[in-house]
Design a protein with these regions (language model features):
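C-terminal, charged low-complexity interaction regions
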Residues: 4, 13-14
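The −1 position to Zn-ligating cysteines in a subset of zinc-ribbon hairpins
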Residues: 5, 29-32
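Short, non-ligating residues that shape and space the ligands of small metal-coordination modules
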Residues: 15-16, 39-40
Length: 94
């Protein structure tokens, strides 16, 4: 089974791929970083440089804010955002 990974934070349990074949966002919120595909990146396809910049800026802010889970009451037991970021090749010390 293919995992649907958030390109912003590496969360690997998105319900659908973040973007469709044409590059449009799926309008899902990432449960981890709260990025809203198709809204926070509206007007850009997945391959657009602006989309990658938006992802990077959102990620940097999320990390700076302490990598909070979208809803603290629903945060998975043993969730580790530092390990999660490795899903997208981001290595940070923790």
């Amino acid at each position: 089974m293919t995992k649907n990974i958030c390109p912003v934070c590496g969360y690997d349990e998105l319900r659908e791929p973040a973007y469709d074949e044409d590059g449009g966002g799926n309008f899902e919120y990432c449960d981890s970083c709260r990025f809203h595909f198709g809204y926070h990146d509206r007007g850009y396809g997945i391959e657009e440089p602006e989309t990658h910049k938006i992802h990077q800026e959102w990620r940097e802010k999320w990390i700076k804010d302490g990598m909070p889970w979208r809803d603290e009451d629903e945060k998975p037991f043993n969730w580790n955002p530092i390990n999660q970021l490795r899903n997208i090749g981001i290595i940070i010390s923790g």
